[in-house]
């Protein structure tokens, strides 16, 4: 057959009369537009794709369940490329067969980040599969439906410089957390406490006496508030305080639900059957999220929740020995308190240590918060009234903390509801040295002993460090046991200080602030300068994460933020605001703020963008971010190889070379940067490899193990592989410096989770001497990006140091580091592919709402079998984007095999049901009227000029080549 008819009919036409047609278009079933834009809020009701109506940032973590399966828009491109690459193999019987690179094909499909979770309808009359568009419904025979996918076009706004074909780049940057806003960690008096002034004294030399209720400045029952002078007296240690539980309005409904469960349990005479652990866990998780929302929770939250439910069941059993002790009769004990005490024991046992507000698991921190509303300071109450103490098996033990009360709770400034002028406590965090003038000869070693008498300096503990090195030499790199905080001295240890735990209310002295409060801490090995102090809220809470909540906010520039290694001192969120489904809405000010950074125009001009927008589209910001990141990374890493430049020339470090000449493809993926670093620095190539080649190279290196990993690295980068092979025979520092490049292969990707929540990998730190340090990665320190790595690489040794002889220990350290990196599987954590791979449609739909609106379409492919095998794409869409542009974008779906796409047909249906047809390539069209009995419809006749179409099982065959 060389001709195909596609009927287009309106309401009143009997569909069963079109039973013989494989494709039909119902132009009368539509979604009414609003304000000239498609009403995407109706998507959940349509047979289209699965996007939930919720906040956009929340939608990023939605697991699509309301669908009929996933499709890959590029599956034909991938399988055709595999088909093109098949090789002839002759077996022993001289039989010739063809084999494709099955491993590559399977990897490409698994690695695709644009899977579409489709919701389809089944037409009862015609038994066709129905796909809804805003202006029509497309129905297709099930034999042809396997190549069908949506083609969403966010309409570009010329004033914003949109390049929506780069939406995938924005999606990618959010996943590697390089398109984020930040807020520094902050604290406030716990809203679950009423802190009441019980007595006062004139100065700290006058002790508080038991029973003394002397008041000087305040009346009886005065509650301490941070904006009241009672707070100043408390901080000065002049007020003796009593803590009582209080229920914040935000979680009143949840506490009411918990009270109902508690009362049922009490009325049943403590029947364990009344304790529904799953129900309790859900309520407690809600409490935890409402009071301190992280938006992105730990990957193993589900497993921990199950353990917590089991602990609840065990603790409420009537014959549990600990429960029996809690139920011993004492005057001050109440059944309601016992309920929360048992929950807290279960939570503590689940986490194997004391639970704090900053606990990463919502159900556990929710248990603490809910218990505080009833008990006040929970752990001191458990110790004093119920004789329960933290277990010696807990890590950390923290028994000494039972004697004090803790009145400050961590708040997330993204969500904290407070008026401007409200007093809080928050961290300041900045680079100790953002830029420095140096020469290659003098290098940029880390100054571990900065000259600042007023600051607290974070220092290495030589004894602990020596022990770690000894253990490394004798037993190899212990990725779970070696920790950076263990080799730092306790004073100023920025990895262990925690204001929530260090500021405490003592029984005799009032509030005791930690010794580091309101003092600068310089942590030279992290190039960090920090201070925690009192401050004020500058702006009200806003859905825009870029709003600056304090008067001394943390940096927002994406490259600077990547340099802030100590991620525990700030929160981040995608720089996105608004709803997932909206016709029209504003975007975050993030993009506008980024456009004001020095060098913004120069970076974009490298990408061919001449007209610099004042309020850019996120796709423009994404191009800027990745281009600047590539230049920055190349600059700092090239300092670690031997250079032929003038050694005594002064230059600024680190810097971005806007004029660095690079060829090949535009960088749209961080894997391209990683591969280009090795190509450029070691192989002297200036050509950027394609995104699929780069991602596959990184995967190949990760999948290999042992000597095979070195072989694969050498296959791709012969010079770098040679340097690795020389590490075991190294005699000078420069010859082992190449080991610091290896983390690049394992620490960053948009579709990995680290195997453990807090592992460490070895890295050299260049100071007055060479140190090997545990570079900690995982959900508590790093976020599957290079945040934990970059700033260490800003340091590099002087020429004299790098050419100096290795001592007797350093070669042993280098050999163990190499051994670790050729065997590590740190990147093999579990990942929810359903969540990660299905967000491209979400980004496109959201982008439409902040730019020019949405244009939607459905595309499928017709196989041509004669005279040459090829494809014709057929698309049904609205008329909002010119057909020629839509056709060019269909070709972009075939970056690997576009030669097989020989024709394109675009049928555009407007809101009134009128349509136009566009065709190119081997296909032509004609529009006719068709009469069936007393009914009439339009029919689009497609002519394939000497080509024959067919092969219903095309995709099935390609997937089985």
UniProtKB/Swiss-Prot annotation:
Keywords of this entry: Capsid protein, Clathrin-mediated endocytosis of virus by host, Host-virus interaction, Inner capsid protein, Viral attachment to host cell, Viral penetration into host cytoplasm, Virion, Virus endocytosis by host, Virus entry into host cell
One Pfam family cited in the UniProt record for this chain: Orbi_VP2
Source organism superkingdom: Viruses
Matching InterPro entries: Capsid_VP2_Orbivir
Subcellular compartments: Virion
GO MF assignments: structural molecule activity
Chain's role: The VP2 protein is one of the two proteins (with VP5) which constitute the virus particle outer capsid. It is the major target of the host immunogenic response. Responsible for viral attachment to target host cell, probably by binding to sialic acid. This attachment induces virion internalization predominantly through clathrin-dependent endocytosis.
Name of the protein: Outer capsid protein VP2
Phylogenetic placement of the source organism: Viruses, Riboviria, Orthornavirae, Duplornaviricota, Resentoviricetes
């Amino acid at each position: 057959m060389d001709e195909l008819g596609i009927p287009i009919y309106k309401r009143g036409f009997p569909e069963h009369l079109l039973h013989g047609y494989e494709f039909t278009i119902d132009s009368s079933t539509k979604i009414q537009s609003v304000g000239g834009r498609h009403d995407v809020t109706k998507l959940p009701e349509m047979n289209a794709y699965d996007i939930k109506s919720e906040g956009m940032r929340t939608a990023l973590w939605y697991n699509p369940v309301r669908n009929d399966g996933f499709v890959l828009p590029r599956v034909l491109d991938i399988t055709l490329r595999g088909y093109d690459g098949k090789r002839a193999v002759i077996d022993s019987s001289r039989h010739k067969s063809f084999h494709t690179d099955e491993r590559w094909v399977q990897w490409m499909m698994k690695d695709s980040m644009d899977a579409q979770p489709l919701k389809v309808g089944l037409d009862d009359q015609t038994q066709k599969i129905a796909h809804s568009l805003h202006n029509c419904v497309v129905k297709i025979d099930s034999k042809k439906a396997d190549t069908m996918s949506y083609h969403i076009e966010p309409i570009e706004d010329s004033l914003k410089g949109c390049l929506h074909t780069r939406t995938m780049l924005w999606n990618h940057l959010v996943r590697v957390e390089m398109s984020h806003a930040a807020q520094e960690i902050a604290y406030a008096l716990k809203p679950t406490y009423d802190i009441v002034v019980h007595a006062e004294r004139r100065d700290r030399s006058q002790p508080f006496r038991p029973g003394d209720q002397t008041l000087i400045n305040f009346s009886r029952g005065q509650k301490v508030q941070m904006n009241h002078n009672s707070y100043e007296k408390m901080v000065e240690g002049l007020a003796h305080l009593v803590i009582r539980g209080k229920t914040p309005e935000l979680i009143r409904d949840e506490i009411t639900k918990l009270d109902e469960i508690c009362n049922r349990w009490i009325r049943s005479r403590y029947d364990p059957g009344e304790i529904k652990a799953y129900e309790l866990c859900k309520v407690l998780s809600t409490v935890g999220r409402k009071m301190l929302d992280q938006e992105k929770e730990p990957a193993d939250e589900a497993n921990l929740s199950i353990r917590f439910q089991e602990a609840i069941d065990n603790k409420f059993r009537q014959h549990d020995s600990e429960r029996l002790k809690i139920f011993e009769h004492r005057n001050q004990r109440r059944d309601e308190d016992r309920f929360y005490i048992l929950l807290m024991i279960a939570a503590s046992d689940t986490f194997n240590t004391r639970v704090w507000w900053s606990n990463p698991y919502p159900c556990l921190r929710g248990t603490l918060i809910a218990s505080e509303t009833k008990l006040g300071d929970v752990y001191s109450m458990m110790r004093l009234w119920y004789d329960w103490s933290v277990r010696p098996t807990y890590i950390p033990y923290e028994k000494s903390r039972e004697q004090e009360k803790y009145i400050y709770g961590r708040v997330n400034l993204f969500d904290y509801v407070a008026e401007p002028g409200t007093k809080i406590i928050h961290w300041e965090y900045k680079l100790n040295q953002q830029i420095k003038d140096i020469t290659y000869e003098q290098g940029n070693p880390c100054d571990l002993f900065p000259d600042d008498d007023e600051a607290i300096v974070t220092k290495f503990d030589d004894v602990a460090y020596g022990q770690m090195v000894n253990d490394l030499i004798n037993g190899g790199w212990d990725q779970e046991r070696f920790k950076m905080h263990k080799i730092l001295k306790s004073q100023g240890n920025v990895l262990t200080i925690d204001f929530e735990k260090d500021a405490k209310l003592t029984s005799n002295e009032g509030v005791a602030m930690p010794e580091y409060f309101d003092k600068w801490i310089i942590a030279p090995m992290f190039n960090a300068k920090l201070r925690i102090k009192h401050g004020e809220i500058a702006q009200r809470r806003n859905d825009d994460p870029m709003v600056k909540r304090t008067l001394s906010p943390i940096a927002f520039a994406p490259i600077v933020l990547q340099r802030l290694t100590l991620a525990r001192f700030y929160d981040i969120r995608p720089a996105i605001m608004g709803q997932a489904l909206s016709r029209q809405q504003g975007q975050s000010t993030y993009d506008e703020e980024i456009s004001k950074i020095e060098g913004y125009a120069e970076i974009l001009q490298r990408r061919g963008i001449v007209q610099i927008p004042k309020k850019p589209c996120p796709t423009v910001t994404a191009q800027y971010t990745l281009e600047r990141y590539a230049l920055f990374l190349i600059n700092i890493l090239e300092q670690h190889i031997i250079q032929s430049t003038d050694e005594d020339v002064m230059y600024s470090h680190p810097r971005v070379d806007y004029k660095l000449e690079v060829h090949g493809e535009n960088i749209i993926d961080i894997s391209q940067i990683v591969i280009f670093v090795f190509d450029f620095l070691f192989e002297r190539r200036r050509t950027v490899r394609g995104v699929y080649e780069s991602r596959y190279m990184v995967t190949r290196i990760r999948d290999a193990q042992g000597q095979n990993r070195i072989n694969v690295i050498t296959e791709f980068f012969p010079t770098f592989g040679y340097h690795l092979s020389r590490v075991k025979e190294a005699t000078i520092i420069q010859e082992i410096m190449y080991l610091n490049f290896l983390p690049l292969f394992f620490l960053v990707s948009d579709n990995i989770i680290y195997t453990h929540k807090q592992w460490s990998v070895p890295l050299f730190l260049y100071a007055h001497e060479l140190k090997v340090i545990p570079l900690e990665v995982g959900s508590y320190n790093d976020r599957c990006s290079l945040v934990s790595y970059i700033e260490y690489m800003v340091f590099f040794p002087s020429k004299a140091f790098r050419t100096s002889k290795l001592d007797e220990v350093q070669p042993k350290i280098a050999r163990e580091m190499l051994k670790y990196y050729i065997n590590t599987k740190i990147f093999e954590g579990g990942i929810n592919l359903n969540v990660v791979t299905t967000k491209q449609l979400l980004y496109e739909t959201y982008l439409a709402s902040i730019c020019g609106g949405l244009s939607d379409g459905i595309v499928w492919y017709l196989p041509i079998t004669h005279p040459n095998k090829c494809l014709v794409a057929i698309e049904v869409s609205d008329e909002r984007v010119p057909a020629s542009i839509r056709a060019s974008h269909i070709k972009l779906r075939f970056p690997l095999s576009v030669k097989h796409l020989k024709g394109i047909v675009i049928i555009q249906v407007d809101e009134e049901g009128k349509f136009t047809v566009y065709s190119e390539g081997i296909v032509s069209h004609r529009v006719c009227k068709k009469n069936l009995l007393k009914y009439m419809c339009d029919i689009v006749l497609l002519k394939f000029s000497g080509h024959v179409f067919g092969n219903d099982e095309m995709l099935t065959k390609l997937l089985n080549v």
